[in-house]
């Protein structure tokens, strides 16, 4: 008995110590796993000082954000006046500039509110065609940078496609005039670019000439590559040829006739700063357009954004390359080619670029791009943000987002009775987490963030207005 007591006195402390160490090790391992999971998680929560990147809103006193160097494109859906820029874009751009991270922004800035309220953004380059002193936009810059003439001609043809993109549900008649009008534009660009004409001068030459005069001028350049594009019109119905030329004129009218646009689109003078796609590698670019000019300047917004997206899609990325944030406000009004947007949300992850697409609802995309392209674009948006207030205002959009948020299990109770007995029945059922119609009734300061990496699939936040610090 004495030996047993001595043995226990000797072993028990060691066993307790071993067990304690084992418990501590397990707790440390669990803590590490939790910490590692938090590090791997794309969405972060932090104080205002620590929050940087895409700021979605507030959860209590913390800010919910996706760090600037993480991946995932964002769609922000809400009616005008609900805070798409004041509660999302401006805090996001400010946070990136305040933290001095290696990231640059391209923003479509309706009415200049974004640029004006981000005064401390470094390396700011503002293109505002309505201002006489705006730096010019050089449409030909990407083409001038090419060495081989064959590459230049190919880029000029691509420019013609950007200027005259196909629309969804075009009938055969409209497509005929568009496609052949694009051939006239391509021929003109290839004919007149090598002789030193700038973009606006070429647009003026095209619009001011009849198709007969234009074809004669193209022939007189002796440029075989250009002439090939108009050879097919020889012997064609003259009314059809005139219709094709008119289609080309319609696409170029803004550039050939609007004095403000003509003044602001050109090659820079010696020593003059200009705006061009490659500037996004070291500049924050704001394209400022008055809200009342959005429809008028849509062709300009389209070509600027399309050229920038083409640049991003082909940029060579290294570990030292900056991240790029493309913020496209009022996307439906920009008339950017759907395939270009789809290519961006699919491939820009590899180019260290994130897209923030702002629109009123999914119906805008359906009208512009059709159902199939719209579904593909939405599927490639990692984060979808719904802002409370007047909300989506469209039943199909409400149903789409309610389905993403999902359903919850519930128990339904029913009672039936007759003369002899009363029966109580329970049955399992599913119901909406948030009813579709209720998405627009969440309160004007509410943000619903739909994110697959959240346990519930979504978060309900409060808006983070830049002016409420």
Predicted features along the sequence, with ranges:
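Extended hydrophobic/Leu-rich segments
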Residues: 4-11, 15, 146-149, 417-420, ...
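Short secondary-structure capping/turn micro-motifs that flank functional sites
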Residues: 16, 133, 364-365
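P-loop NTPase motor domains
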Residues: 30-31, 36-44, 59, 65-353, ...
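Compositionally biased, intrinsically disordered low-complexity regions
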Residues: 48, 55, 59-62, 390, ...
